[in-house]
Every structure is written in C-alpha cells, then in structure tokens.
Amino acid sequence: MSARAAPSRRRQAGRRLRYLPTGSFPFLLLLLLLCIQLGGGQKKKENLLAEKVEQLMEWSSRRSIFRMNGDKFRKFVKAPPRNYSMIVMFTALQPQRQCSVCRQANEEYQILANSWRYSSAFCNKLFFGMVDYDEGTDVFQQLNMNSAPTFMHFPSKGRPKRADTFDLQRIGFAAEQLAKWIADRTDVHIRVFRPPNYSGTIALALLVSLVGGLLYLRRNNLEFIYNKTGWAMVSLCIVFAMTSGQMWNHIRGPPYAHKNPHNGQVSYIHGSSQAQFVAESHIILVLNAAITMGMVLLNEAATSKGDVGKRRIICLVGLGLVVFFFSFLLSIFRSKYHGYPYSFLIK
C-alpha cells in the first residue's frame, strides 16, 4: 500500500511544480537577495558598533575624559549605531577666552569622570567627553549653543530631551550634583571620590594656634573676652555670611560669575530666583554691611551727647547709607523676582 502511494505523491508534486506561475521565480530570487542584504547590513552595523565601543574603551583607558572635535563628535555621539550613553561638557578652556567658570567646572567634571573610571561598576555603557569651543566651533553652531560651560547627556537611543541638559545655573556644577543628574538620566550610579584636601585642616590648625597664642600672651589680662563690641562684630560677620547665601554656595557649588563666550559680557547677578553666583553673595554681603553701618550711625546720632552739628552730620551720613544701599538691594531683588511691583530710588 505504501509502495503504491509513493509514486502517486511524486506525480502530484510534479503537477504542482508545473502549475507554479513562471513570474514567481524572480520574486523568490528578489526576496532571497533582500534577506541576504538585510543580514549583511545587520552584520555591518554590529561590526561598526563594536569598533566604536572598542575605540571609546581605548580612549577611556588613557584618559577618563576624551576631547572631541566636530568629526569625532558626529561619529561617536550623533551617528548610529550606539548602545552607550555619552556625557559631554561643552566648554571654552583656552586662556584667551578668560572663562574662569569653565576651569572650575572642568575640575569637578574631572573628579566625576575619574570616580567612574576607577570604580568597580565601570563598563562600556557610559563615557565622558569634552568639546572645546576652539576645537569644535561647528558643534556649538549645530546645537545652537551660546554659553559655556554646558553639560549634556546623549542617550543610547533617541534624541536628547530637555532634561538631558544639566541645569547648571540653578544646581551648580559640583561633582555630586552631576552624579545625581547622571543617575536620573542613565540609572548609572557613580560614587564620587574626591582627592584629599588638607587646606581646611591647615586653616583650622592655624586658627587654633593663633587663638591659643593670643590667649597665652594675654593670660594675665583676659578682659577682652568680655568685650561686647568684639563679640558684636563677630556675630555680625556670621549673620552677613549666612544671609548672603554663603551656605548655599558651599552646598551647591555655583560659578563665581557667568561670562558669555560670544560677546564677553560678565554677569555677576543671576537672573533667576532659584540660583545665584558667588559674586552675587559678596555683593549682597557688602550691601547688608553698608545698611547696618547706616543704622549704627543713626543710632549713634540719636543717643550720643556730643556736638549737635556733629550729630547732625552723622545722622545724614547714616540716613544716606541706608537709603542708597537699601534701594540698590531692592533693585537686585526686583531683577531676580520678575514682576515684583515695588522699588525705591533705583529701578
């Protein structure tokens, strides 16, 4: 039974082949060539990706941050394929640019990149690069970037979003803040290791030695410890430092000022109420000190029992200090809190 059925099945298959349309053979051949081409293209992408990752790992083994010009930026950051994330700092480190903020940000960026490079979690999923304005002007123009320094995250898939640009003006550029931002964008957690800094210890030792030496020299007469004026001056210095935002600067690590790399204009006052510069803290400290001095002079003019003419001059000087510097302080407040309706003398 099975021997008779075998020739019958072969005859039926032959009939099906005879009735197969002749136009289908080119289609099958084209489909076969397309599959071969797709397979070859995928293999080519894999080889290209492997070459890029190998090159990036080689650069990372030499330096934790590698510098890029326009061609390298387009090849390793913008062009596919990519299965890695890139953190790029756009800066202007050349001396003629006179960007002190760029140098400070570069130091923090270097600390962060070194912490990642020498950590046990280091892998080929995250790399750190840098584009200097004088080495990649075309990159700045391509990204419509008009300020430096700027930190951007380029994800492995898709285009960078708004949150992929680090808010340096509000948060500052401390390595710890950058590490937190990177963790939010890439899920890569970097523990920052800072090199030992003994300047604080040395300063504290000098201060203790100075105070100890002063107490030793004045050991027979310690009445100065009970001097109200001295303690009042110390208290005022602490109050001025805290009200000017020095603690915020210590935590956030903002730049001293901001210099526009195109026109060279330097800004000492931040335009937002959510951030400030170090220079801004110094300005506020001086203004508060001047207003306080004016108030002290007014009090002195009212309570002293000296010459009336002299007291009147002291009163006018104190009033002038309070009026002028308070008006200046209020104008800075209005520039940061847009829409604040009140002003005094200076707008």
From Swiss-Prot:
Residues 218-221, 298-312 are cytoplasmic. GO terms for biological process: cognition; magnesium ion transport; protein N-linked glycosylation via asparagine. Keywords: Disulfide bond, Endoplasmic reticulum, Glycoprotein, Magnesium, Membrane, Signal, Transmembrane, Transmembrane helix, Transport. GO terms for molecular function: oligosaccharyltransferase complex binding. Disulfide bonds join 99-102. Glycans are attached at residue 83. This is Dolichyl-diphosphooligosaccharide--protein glycosyltransferase subunit TUSC3. It comes from Mus musculus (Mouse). The lineage of its organism: Eukaryota, Metazoa, Chordata, Craniata, Vertebrata.
